[in-house]
Each structure stands twice: as structure tokens, then as C-alpha cells.
Amino acid sequence: FDQYINLRPARLMPGVIAPVVRRDGSPRLPGEIDMLIVRENTEGEYSSIGGRMYEGTPREIVMQETVMSRYGVDRVLKFAFELAQSRPKKHLTSATKSNGIAITMPYWDERVAEMAKAYPDVKVDKFHIDILTAHFVQRPDFFDVVVASNLFGDILSDLGPACTGTIGIAPSANLNPSRTMPSLFEPVHGSAPDIAGQGIANPIGQIWCGAMMLDFLGYRAAHDA
């Protein structure tokens, strides 16, 4: 369905204790962590291009290719920039690793820099994925909108909600912003069959996904309710 945006909010909710405290040791307050992680969802590192040769022998070779197209990269960056532009902080962070992944990630950085020219009111920064994960833990309140490739977005979209205390209530939206195909909204962080039938499962993730769906479909009043 060409759901090329995976949108993953991470917000510290009332009644949830964040495992990451402030630098002075005091607990973080509800809403203090409030970020949106935008993951490229159709290409990147999760391509099916590759293969195996000489399987089972000492000469065995395994290869898998990363695919980044200008079309694919630009459309996720455009979505992320417009999202950042719509928020009070107007702050976009790009996840990269161009100091080690020498071809695809420098290209990603180039496209971020080019796209930024069209959004002069958005503050843009970039971090290599290793230090970015450290910053998620040390200062999650710094982040607003974070845009990443398929693999890096996959990592960050679990880490972000974990910093808010639980991944169990985190929502997810697989979006086709062009609306030429259906979009999909679901709480994606697994199930808990060990508590089935006990009436204690937290419905926040499902409710939040429903609210995101209503917002995407243009029912803002219903979303706010």
C-alpha cells in the first residue's frame, strides 16, 4: 500500500514513571518527553536485494543491499520537515551514520541539507545513530521530530517510547500521505498473552492509534475528544 511513513509518537503520560530522570535526579513530568519519530518505511536497509553464494562452505558469502532513492528519501524528509514546522519547537533531528556508512548515509545527509533550504524556520541538527541513542536516554526532552532511515527508525521508535516508561502504550501509524492507498494504525509493540482475560490490559495504545487515525482522516474534533 506504499505506506512510506511510519510515524511513532513517544510521550510521557500522566501516571507513568519515566526510567530516565533529569540530570539532577528529579523525576520527569508528564509531557516533558514529547517527540515524534518519522521512519522511512518502504526502502533503505530493509530491501530484498542480495543473496547467498557457496552456502555451507568455507567460501560462503552473504550480501544484502541498502536502497535509497531520491524519490523515497525526499518524500519522507518532506513529511518530517512539514511535521516539525507545524509544532511549537520547529525542531528536526536527522539520524545518520555518515562517518562509517560511506555511500548511502552521506547521500541521506545531502538530501536533508537540500530539503532544509525550503524550511528556513525549522531548526535542523543531525547526530550519528550511536550518540543519538545515548542522547535519547540522557536528554529525551531535547527532541521534537526525529527523522530516520528504515533501520535507524526501527531502533529509535522502540527506544523513544521505552524512555517514557513503557512501549506497551505506544501507538503507530503506517501512512500513505498522498492518500492514494490505505493507511494503517495499530499499537505495534507486541502482545501480552499472559494477562489475557484478566481485564488489566492497558488500552491507551489502541485509543491513541484511533485518535491518530481520526486526525489523519480530518476529524480533528473527534481526535481532540
Residue ranges and their predicted role:
Residues 1, 136-224:
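Glycine-rich phosphate/nucleotide-binding loop
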Residues 19-22, 47-52, 103-108, 136-139, ...:
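Short acidic, glycine/serine/threonine-rich loops at helix termini
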Residues 106-155, 187:
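Active-site rim loops that border cofactor/substrate pockets in soluble metabolic enzymes
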Residues 1-5, 39-42, 81-88, 96, ...:
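Structural signal for hydrophobic packing residues in well-ordered secondary-structure cores
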Residues 50, 65, 78-86, 100, ...:
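Phosphate/ribose-phosphate-bearing ligand recognition and processing surfaces
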Residues 57-130:
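Glycine-rich phosphate/diphosphate-binding loop of Rossmann-like nucleotide-binding domains
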Residues 18-28, 81-84, 133-137:
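A generic local secondary-structure boundary/capping motif
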Residues 1-63, 151:
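N-terminal glycine-rich phosphate/adenylate-binding segment common to multiple enzyme folds
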